[in-house]
Amino acid sequence: MKTLIVSTVLAFITFSAQAAAFQVTSNEIKTGEQLTTSHVFSGFGCEGGNTSPSLTWSGVPEGTKSFAVTVYDPDAPTGSGWWHWTVVNIPATVTYLPVDAGRRDGTKLPTGAVQGRNDFGYAGFGGACPPKGDKPHHYQFKVWALKTEKIPVDSNSSGALVGYMLNANKIATAEITPVYEIK
């Protein structure tokens, strides 16, 4: 009987810990699945809608004071990957970004949120655009739970600088990694 009780308690603790895990979901993108053309860049030889997908996160870690979202392609043939989007200073009360939140004018972002400069050269979302014929690229859509309310960056800050600041203030991350290739 004692073993049954201990086993039940351990199972409950394990289930509770798993249920509370920090995670991100989207209605438009899934890990391992091909991005649709709506999330592909418009330019650089690519023809897409250049629209960021919706993102919803849950299981927020204790102590979270703000969030950030990044989109990074580690497979880009640059020697340093490719930053497609950085947005920081999302209030801790926000757990959702709508479709096209990454538009250049920032009108769909929460008050106080700041978009950094992507590797296409502007502040906002830049969709997938791998070289034609290259292997499938992995696009890391990552939500960061942060231990600070504000990351001291602006709309001209590079992805590398934003990434450095996020790593210095990270509590946890949650990620969706779809793929894209142009055959």
Swiss-Prot record:
Domain of life: Bacteria
Extent of the signal sequence: 1-21
Principal location class: periplasm
Compartments it resides in: Periplasm
Keyword Disulfide bond: yes
Keywords on record: Disulfide bond, Periplasm, Signal
Disulphide connectivity of cysteines: C46-C129
GO cellular component terms listed in the entry, alphabetical order: outer membrane-bounded periplasmic space
Self-association and partners: Homodimer.
Record-stated family: Belongs to the UPF0098 family.
Additional facts recorded: Encoded by the cryptic lambdoid prophage DLP12.
Name this polypeptide is given: UPF0098 protein YbcL
Lineage: Bacteria, Pseudomonadati, Pseudomonadota, Gammaproteobacteria, Enterobacterales
